């Protein structure tokens, strides 16, 4: 780990001021970083993948509340920990898909530290990104992509480019994508802007090192959730081991039905894309069906119409089809509600 300066911000404006003043005098590789929980950033610093000359501590900023919005949704502070968010009674009752996604990730200790804003910004877990002696366009632009000719069975098959095939690792972000969350960002000029999560992440294309729409001096302050969705909420995650592992494939789902007919379907996927993935065309295919094998097969074929698979990754298409069939059939056996988590489920 390289030597760095540490400064604690007293307010959002103070944090942005420190950041913009420092960035104006530093090279890209030396830029300062905001740090909240630090559960991903500190690992990257230990491996010298990130080498900030300054850390700006924002963990004590007053961004740790969860409040109702006038529209009937929720406004979540960026400093709310993953554990706090998963344990919140409204999240458990009305946004159970989000609570389930949060509880499927990391360990209780990490969830206690990880912030909501930071979770959205965590970096890929591609093997080659974490190996400084391997080429990686995401870590070092124009150095090449070691994963394409190497081991990539856990990487993306949608939204990739010749430059990068890394997946986005966040479970929470998959649920946020399904819920159409909105990211509130304070800018260096003091203004705020709201960005739908569908527009927050950038595809790798020719610049895989640029992962979001954040600009110099931008700071995530809140995440807004729309009003709750009716239906059966679920989050299913297939991984190499039962705990503390990233998804090979994950599916966030909210499914509403009338007897044996699907009347509303929302789906978002993790482990298959360069960002949390949603395709509304497959939802339209399933709505009005009974979730039969033919409808599921057509939906999955539509989802993977532009997928880039090979002998290492083609299993993901089969895995998604089987998992989606299981999710739909399970939902049809449950009443139309948000499938709230019981108080006995630990965050």
Question: How would you label these PLM feature ranges?
Answer:
Residues 1-347:
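C-terminal structural segment of proteins
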């Amino acid at each position: 780990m390289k030597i760095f300066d540490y400064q604690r911000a007293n307010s959002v404006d103070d944090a942005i001021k420190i950041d913009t003043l420092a960035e104006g005098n530093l090279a890209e590789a030396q830029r300062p970083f905001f740090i909240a929980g630090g559960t991903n950033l500190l690992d990257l610093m230990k491996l010298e993948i990130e080498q900030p000359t300054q850390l700006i501590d924002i963990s004590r900023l007053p961004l740790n509340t969860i409040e109702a919005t006038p529209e009937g949704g929720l406004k979540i502070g960026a400093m709310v920990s993953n554990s706090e968010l998963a344990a919140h009674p409204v999240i458990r009752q009305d946004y159970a898909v989000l609570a389930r996604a949060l509880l499927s990730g990391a360990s209780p200790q990490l969830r206690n530290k990880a912030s909501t804003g930071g979770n959205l910004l965590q970096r890929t877990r591609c093997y080659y990104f974490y190996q400084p002696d391997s080429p990686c366009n995401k870590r070092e632009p124009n150095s090449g992509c070691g994963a394409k000719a190497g081991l990539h069975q856990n990487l993306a098959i949608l939204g990739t480019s010749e430059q990068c095939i890394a997946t986005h690792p966040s479970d929470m972000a998959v649920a946020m994508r399904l819920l159409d969350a909105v990211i509130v960002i304070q800018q260096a000029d003091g203004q705020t802007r709201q960005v739908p999560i569908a527009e927050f992440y950038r595809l790798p294309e020719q610049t895989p090192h640029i992962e979001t729409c954040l600009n110099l001096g931008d700071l995530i302050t809140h995440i807004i959730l729309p009003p709750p969705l009716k239906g059966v909420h679920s989050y299913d995650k297939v991984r190499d081991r039962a705990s503390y592992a990233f998804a090979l494939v994950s599916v966030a789902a909210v499914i509403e039905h009338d007897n044996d007919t699907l009347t509303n379907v929302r789906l978002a996927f993790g482990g298959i894309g360069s960002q949390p993935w949603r395709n509304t065309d497959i939802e339209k295919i399933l709505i009005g069906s009974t979730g039969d094998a033919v409808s599921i097969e057509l939906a999955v074929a539509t989802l993977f119409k532009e997928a880039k698979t090979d002998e290492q990754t083609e299993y993901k298409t089969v895995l998604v089809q089987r998992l989606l069939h299981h999710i739909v059939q399970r939902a049809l056996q449950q009443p139309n509600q948000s499938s709230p988590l019981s108080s006995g489920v630990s965050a």
